[in-house]
Every structure is written in structure tokens, then in C-alpha cells.
């Protein structure tokens, strides 16, 4: 093989790799801290649903996750999707991002930038900025539903710094008729509601992560999606993410 031909083949291969990379949307995780008891939250919930459905940012795959906090539950309406763990997670972000306090609705983009869930302009700018950040490859495989439990395998590429791997089982869609509280009399819709959220493991600097996870599901709910992401320690920047739909299947509780 001549040097010219070898050089030409290598050039074509390099261009092919660049094209493939350019065609792969960059995953950007959008966490929305929300509550059915908060009158400012429904517009943010609608915004999250729009982002999920339309994917408006070229070159970006927005991976949305609704995390319902519980500090509104004593204000006239108990949100059935609320979980104190999300209140704690939001407070950790408030400490990390040096905020005076937690609030709803709040968006956190890739663990690095926060904004009001109703500030669409600031959020959109954060999505654009996140697109250029390097990301670790992350894959979800071998998913299996059985007796109200989801099992899956998670693999990542080498991480640039030590990181935690989180996995969330999220309900695709839900609706509620709120009877009391600030949203009393209103019909609310949600998307990607986190129902189970666990830390799957850790990866050391320069190493890849590979592990199996087992998540308990809420019976008779569905369909679901599985979301995984790699996050720097102490709820730092999210450096990789993936989402896998479970289609139209529901999870059923075993006997």
C-alpha cells in the first residue's frame, strides 16, 4: 500500500468518526424540583413536558427528570409523588451552588447551573452552554422487568475524575386532580416523575464503571423510563447520562 493511499484511508476514517460524533446528541440532564402544592410549579411542569416532547436544542438530548419535594405537603395538599430524598438532594444543590435557600420550581442543568423552572430564557442558554461540555459515554442494557423489580446493566467509559453513578426509575407521564392547597381545583400533568432513585456505585479517576442495578417499582404504574447519569462527587457536575424507555409495559407486583 502506498503512503498516499494509507494517508487517504486514515483521513476518511477520521472524517467518518467526526461525522458520527457530530450526529450523536450530547446528553444534558434537566432536573426539576417541583410540587403539586406549589402554585408556581404547573407552568414549569408544562415547560419540562415541552422540552421532553420537542427536544428543541440542536445537537442536544435533554434528559428530563421531575423530582417532587415534600416541604409543601403540609400546605393543604400532599403530593403523592413527593419524597424527602428529593428535598435533601435539592438542599445539597443549594449548598453546592451557594444559594440562600431551596425553592420551587427550580431547574438544575447538568448539576452545574440552576434557574427558576419558569425562566425559560436562562434555561435555554444553559442548555446551549452544556452542549459543548465533554461527556463520558454511558450505556444502559439488559433491562428486565419481573415482579415489580427492574434489573439493568450500566456501563460507562473512563471518567476524567472520580464520580458517582446514579440511576432513576421515572414514570413517563402522570396526571392529578388537585383538590386543596394552592392548586386546588386544577388538573396537573407531569413528565418523567422520579419514583425510585439510587446510587449505583462509584468510578475512580481514569476508570470505567460497570455494574448491575436493581430498582423497586411502584405496582400498577407505567410506562417507565430508566435514567442513569455520572456525577462528580458531592452533587457536582454531571459528566455523562443516558435514558432508556421501557415502552408501554407496566410493572406488576409479584405475589
Task: Place the predicted regions along the sequence by residue.
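Bacterial N-terminal signal peptides
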Residues: 9-17
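Thiol-based oxidoreductase modules, predominantly thioredoxin-like and allied folds used
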Residues: 58-87
Amino acid at each position: 500500500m502506498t503512503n498516499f493511499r494509507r494517508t487517504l484511508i486514515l483521513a476518511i476514517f477520521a472524517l467518518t468518526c467526526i461525522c458520527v460524533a457530530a450526529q450523536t446528541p450530547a446528553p444534558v440532564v434537566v432536573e426539576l424540583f417541583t410540587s403539586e402544592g406549589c402554585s408556581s410549579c404547573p407552568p414549569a411542569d408544562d415547560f419540562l413536558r415541552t422540552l421532553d416532547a420537542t427536544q428543541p436544542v440542536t445537537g442536544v438530548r435533554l434528559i428530563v427528570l421531575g423530582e417532587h419535594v415534600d416541604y409543601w405537603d403540609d400546605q393543604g395538599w400532599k403530593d403523592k409523588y413527593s419524597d424527602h430524598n428529593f428535598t435533601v438532594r435539592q438542599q445539597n444543590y443549594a449548598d453546592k451552588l451557594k444559594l440562600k435557600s431551596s425553592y420551587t420550581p427550580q431547574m438544575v442543568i447538568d448539576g452545574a447551573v440552576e434557574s427558576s423552572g419558569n425562566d425559560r430564557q436562562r434555561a435555554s442558554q444553559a442548555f446551549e452552554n452544556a452542549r459543548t461540555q465533554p461527556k463520558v459515554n454511558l450505556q444502559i442494557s439488559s433491562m428486565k422487568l419481573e415482579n415489580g423489580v427492574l434489573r439493568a446493566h450500566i456501563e460507562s467509559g473512563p471518567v476524567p475524575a472520580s464520580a458517582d453513578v446514579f440511576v432513576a426509575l421515572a414514570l413517563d407521564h402522570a396526571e392529578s386532580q388537585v383538590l386543596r392547597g394552592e392548586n386546588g381545583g386544577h388538573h396537573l400533568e407531569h413528565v418523567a416523575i422520579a419514583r425510585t432513585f439510587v446510587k449505583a456505585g462509584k468510578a475512580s479517576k481514569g476508570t470505567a464503571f460497570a455494574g448491575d442495578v436493581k430498582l423497586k417499582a411502584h405496582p400498577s404504574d407505567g410506562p417507565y423510563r430508566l435514567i442513569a447519569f455520572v456525577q462528580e462527587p458531592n452533587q457536582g457536575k454531571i459528566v455523562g447520562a443516558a435514558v432508556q424507555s421501557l415502552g408501554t409495559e407496566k410493572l406488576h407486583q409479584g405475589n
